[in-house]
C-alpha cells in the first residue's frame, strides 16, 4: 500500500510527471519529512498499542492512510500538498510495525515470534513488489499513476476492514 506511493515523491523527477515543476529539492524534503514523521508515528503507535486495542489502532491507521491518499489525489497537487502528504503519511507509514508485532506476540506468544513476524514481513515485501511492478505496468499502459493510486486506496480500505474481525483474546490452553 505504501511502497507504490513513494514513486511520485521521489527525488528522481517523478514529481514533475504529476505536474509539480519545482526542483528536486522538494522530493528530498518530502522524503526527509516522511522519515521524521515515521519516528514520531512509530513511537506513538507503540505507546498507544500498550494502552488500547491493537486491532482497532491498526484499522485506524489503514483508514487514515486511505483518507490521506484519497485527499491527496483528488485535490490539486502543489508543493505544499506534497509536504503535508509526506508528513501525514509518514506518521502512519511504519506505525503498523509495533502494533503488528505486538498483536502477534499477544495472540501466539513469543516462542515463534520471529517466524510468524518473518512471514508477515515477507508477505509485505511481496505486496511491495507487486505494488511497484503493477504501478510500472499501469504507468506504461496509461501514462500516469492514477489507476495504481486508486488501487492503493482500495488496498488500504481492505486492510482496515480485515483487521476488525481479529480476536485479541488468547486461548491460554494452547501451548506457546
Model-derived features: where do they sit?
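Extracytoplasmic gate region of multi-pass secondary transporters
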Residues: 1-45, 131
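Intracellular helix-loop hinge segments at the cytoplasmic ends of transmembrane helices
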Residues: 9, 13, 98-107
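Interfacial helix-cap and linker-helix signal at transmembrane-aqueous boundaries
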Residues: 15-19, 48-49, 134-143
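C-terminal transmembrane helical hairpin of 12-TM major facilitator-type secondary transporters
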Residues: 26, 33-38, 44, 49-103
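Transmembrane alpha-helical cores of Major Facilitator Superfamily
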Residues: 32-36, 63, 118-126
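A late C-terminal transmembrane helix in Major Facilitator Superfamily
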Residues: 94, 107-142
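Multi-pass alpha-helical transporter architecture, strongest
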Residues: 153-176
